[in-house]
Amino acid sequence: MKSPEALDAALQEIPAGCCVIVPLKIEGGALLYQSQVKGAVASGACKDATLTIREIAESIQSHQLSAIAKLSLLDDAYYPTYDTTAGFLLEDGYSRWLDNKPEKGGKPWMSPFSDSAAAYLQALTAEIMQAGFQNILCTDLDYPHFYDTDLELLGSPVQSKQNRAEGLIRVLNGVHQTASQQGGGAMYTFSLYDALNRDAEALQPVMLNTPSAVVYIDPNSFRDSFWHNNQKISMSGLSMQEKLQVLMPIAQELCGDMHLIPCFRERSFRQQEQTQAEAWLRENGYTQYMFK
């Protein structure tokens, strides 16, 4: 999104009536639009952006497309460098945690326990929604890798599984509440493979206010067998469509009452397999799905 002309050329390739997912906050915390949020400007998060959020939204709307903003929530080094209270602090209350030694390029991460971090994400959400985006697709709602020594220095908030989950859910629900005030909402994203390996820490549908979940599914990740609900499920020898028939009900179960939008890894499918998969999805009532 370096210029209005480049954006317009890209949008012309998309059929009218489709939905466009636009990455606006990427891993590392950089913004791909000129923000007016004080923390975004002061931290340098949008220093390389050229287009305003309204220019992006209006260009999408002019092509009769719906706009969804994709935001990397917590993988952010810009804002907690500017405001240290937005990052992880050690138990002493002022020393900040970095993901490596400073001389090796160590950087901070946004903490889900920080009021400042939550306020920053909600301010960005409000700015984006007010420009004309319909929904917020939330990614990177997770923690950096902590070594045992890190956990000791950071203390109970990151040691307790329940505290960890509640911190992530608080951030997501805050973004959703802000988006819903503008007539939209936030969508939770998680990998089915991660969820089955207990790595999707925020996946507690009863506590989540988000109405929809985008679930990343790569059938090729399930080559042998896996456990679910104390049952060993074998995937060996199954066709792509047979794998789909096994995995989709599990994904729906994990989503609870949230509306499931499956997102499949396109490179895992041959063309015929994708055609068959799309037909099966439609036959089974899945009108919203993605291959990417």
Question: What function would you assign to each model-found segment?
Answer:
Residues 5-32, 127-138, 208-216, 283-288:
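Catalytic domains of carbohydrate-active enzymes, especially glycoside hydrolases
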Residues 1, 37-50, 104-119, 157-164, ...:
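The substrate-binding groove and active-site-proximal loops of carbohydrate-active enzymes
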Residues 19-27, 109-113, 117, 121-150:
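Active-site groove signature of glycoside hydrolases
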Residues 66-75, 137-140, 162-201, 252-271:
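Aromatic-lined carbohydrate-recognition surfaces of secreted/lumenal glycan-active proteins
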Residues 17-50, 152:
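Aromatic-lined carbohydrate-binding/catalytic grooves of carbohydrate-active enzymes
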Residues 34-42, 76-101, 144-159:
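Aromatic- and acidic-residue-enriched segments that line the glycan-binding/catalytic groove
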Residues 210-292:
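Substrate-binding cleft of secreted/luminal carbohydrate-active enzymes
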Residues 1, 74-126:
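Active-site-adjacent "subsite" loops/lids of carbohydrate-active enzymes
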